[in-house]
Curated annotation (Swiss-Prot):
Keywords: ATP synthesis, CF(0), Chloroplast, Hydrogen ion transport, Ion transport, Membrane, Plastid, Thylakoid, Transmembrane, Transmembrane helix, Transport
Cited function: Key component of the proton channel; it plays a direct role in the translocation of protons across the membrane.
Gene name per UniProt: atpI
Pfam families documented for this protein: ATP-synt_A
Origin: domain of life: Eukaryota
Protein name from the UniProt record: ATP synthase subunit a, chloroplastic
Transmembrane segments: 38-58, 95-115, 133-153, 199-219, 220-240
Keyword Calcium: no
Membrane topology summary: Multi-pass membrane protein
GO CC annotation: chloroplast thylakoid membrane; plasma membrane; proton-transporting ATP synthase complex
Subcellular location: Plastid, Chloroplast thylakoid membrane
InterPro entries linked to this entry: ATP_syn_F0_a_bact/chloroplast, ATP_synth_F0_asu, ATP_synth_F0_asu_AS, F0_ATP_A_sf
Length: 247
């Protein structure tokens, strides 16, 4: 079984998937590059919300914490607990990475329901949550893949690759393909759930614009938070797995 060409083909497929389009899109032409403007705009808004809220809440830490400081301390403790549970005692260096993934995805998902993106008119397409676009979810999944390969190589050196022939060399092709398909599952799970949630809300609003969409929107907020938690948990679990060397 020729594994290396299969793995290369899988990576090429993941790269090609990043070009998949749903609906119309607005592009900026910068030099010789075509930039997906909608994703950049909404991502910048999400990043600005995160940075702004953190700066406002903790720019002047108090001995007796304010409500904002308490909130972000709770978030930090939550991310530390999640990282420690999945990675183990060496979780410390990975808290910023896992926390960034969780917070960006969480705020991105919620922005699709809470921010009035559609009042901003564009020449082509419309604004939506960044995670509503496959380009964003693939861009989040690829660094996760790099992170767990890096974690394993840093911990075990070239001995890291010994896991591919455990418990038996017969499983070598499956073990290799498993690692290269992890970013596919991460990106499609997040993209599919967020896109489906927004489509359901749009359809219900068009059919019954007053009452029915409200509970569906609350359910969407809940599932959006769960999707952020699932992504961060799986990312931490993959990193912990690569450092421990077991499946």
């Amino acid at each position: 079984m020729n594994v290396i060409p299969c793995s290369i083909k899988t990576l090429k497929g993941l790269y090609d998937i990043s070009g998949v389009e749903v609906g119309q899109h607005l592009y900026w032409q910068i030099g010789g590059l075509q930039i997906h403007a909608q994703v950049l705009i909404t991502s910048w808004v999400v990043i600005a919300i995160l940075l702004g809220s953190v700066i406002i809440a903790v720019r002047n830490p108090q001995t007796i914490p304010t409500n904002g400081q308490n909130f972000f301390e709770y978030v930090l403790e939550f991310i530390q607990d999640l990282s420690k549970t999945q990675i183990g005692e060496e979780y410390g260096p990975w808290v910023p990475f896992i926390g960034t993934m969780f917070l960006f995805i969480f705020v991105s998902n919620w922005s699709g329901a809470l921010l009035p993106w559609k009042i901003i008119k564009l020449p082509h397409g419309e604004l939506a949550a960044p995670t509503n676009d496959i380009n964003t979810t693939v861009a989040l999944a690829l660094p996760t893949s790099v992170a767990y390969f890096y974690a394993g190589l840093r911990k075990k050196g070239l001995g890291y690759f010994g896991k591919y022939i455990q418990p038996t060399p017969i499983l070598l092709p499956i073990n290799i393909l498993e690692d290269f398909t992890k970013p596919l599952s991460l990106s499609f799970r997040l993209f599919g759930n967020i896109l489906a949630d927004e489509l359901v809300v749009v359809v219900l609003v068009s059919l019954v614009p007053s009452v029915v969409p409200i509970p569906v929107m609350f359910l969407g907020l809940f599932t959006s938070g769960i999707q952020a938690l699932i992504f961060a948990t799986l990312a931490a679990a993959y990193i912990g797995e690569s450092m421990e060397g077991h499946h």
